[in-house]
Amino acid sequence: NAVAAYVRDCGRDVVIFPAGLEGKFSLEDTWCAGLILADLGAQELGDGARTAKLVCEQIDRHELVNTTHGKRLQNLGLHGDLAFCLELDRSSGVIIWDQASGWGALKR
């Protein structure tokens, strides 16, 4: 997992923040956060992180097509996009938000 590798290599504290959808909880974002935590082998977790990790362990990623956002993509006919989103380890790049500029930057 490129994100977990970046976190291990950066030597800093990192916040994993599931963005959600329109200000609401998002199962797929929480699942992804749990996957990153599992890949990191994180040991000391707060309640939110433990919940994310449990979500990832208990829900098969292919079930994420049934989430609110998954159904939205299906209704828009974006089946290829949805299939792409369900792939793991597709890229070695990680988008990092730069606080100073307010922009994301691709790190490899």
Predicted segments with their positions:
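Long, charged alpha-helical interface segments
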Residues: 10, 27-108
